[in-house]
Regions:
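Catalytic cores and adjacent flexible loops of soluble metabolic enzymes
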Residues: 1-172
Length: 172
């Protein structure tokens, strides 16, 4: 599978974004998104999103991270299978452009992720190592992992879920 095919299956159509943001705001929620290129950053800037999330498979795209960080909004970086060096590089990219509004998400890159692979002890380790707020990108089919992550210091929760088990494209 190429990254192009992955993006084709994973992206939220641009024409949905303004309505999703409007509905989120009506519900008192903060709506932001993961851009995959500079064009999508510009699109999201035009919508005045308050923050950005860097998807785990973009953590080594330093030019993209610098461009996102240059908007001087909070940047939430999902770590997936990244090495500590990859994470340090992404953090440095944000700081290089003067943005220190950074948080990290501990992420198990498996869909769905087995609870046994959650490795939540990584959360306090990342918080200590990087001196940043750390959260969880939870791909498990359970709510227990997210709850346990808060006990271990998670400050942000991203929960993936499936709207329709018969439709693999309904993962949110």
């Amino acid at each position: 599978t190429t990254l192009y095919k992955l993006y084709q299956n994973a992206f939220t159509p641009w024409e949905w974004q303004p309505e999703l943001k409007h509905i989120a705001e009506e519900e008192g929620l903060i709506c932001f998104s993961s851009p995959f290129d500079k064009t999508s950053v510009d699109f999201l800037e035009a919508m005045d999103v308050p923050a950005y999330k860097i998807a785990s498979f973009e953590i080594t795209d330093i030019p993209l991270i610098e461009y996102v960080a240059s908007k001087m909004k909070p940047v939430i970086i999902s770590t997936g299978i990244a090495t500590y060096e990859d994470i340090e590089g992404a953090i440095a990219a944000c700081k290089r452009v003067g943005n220190d509004q950074i948080a990290l998400l501990k992420c198990t890159s498996s869909y769905p992720a087995p609870v046994a692979l959650a490795n939540l002890r990584t959360i306090p380790d990342m918080r200590e190592r990087f001196k940043l707020p750390v959260g969880l990108s939870d791909h498990t089919m359970s709510s227990s992992v997210a709850i346990a992550s808060v006990a271990l210091g998670a400050r942000i929760l991203e929960k993936h879920f499936i709207l329709d088990r018969g439709d693999r494209k309904s993962v949110v």
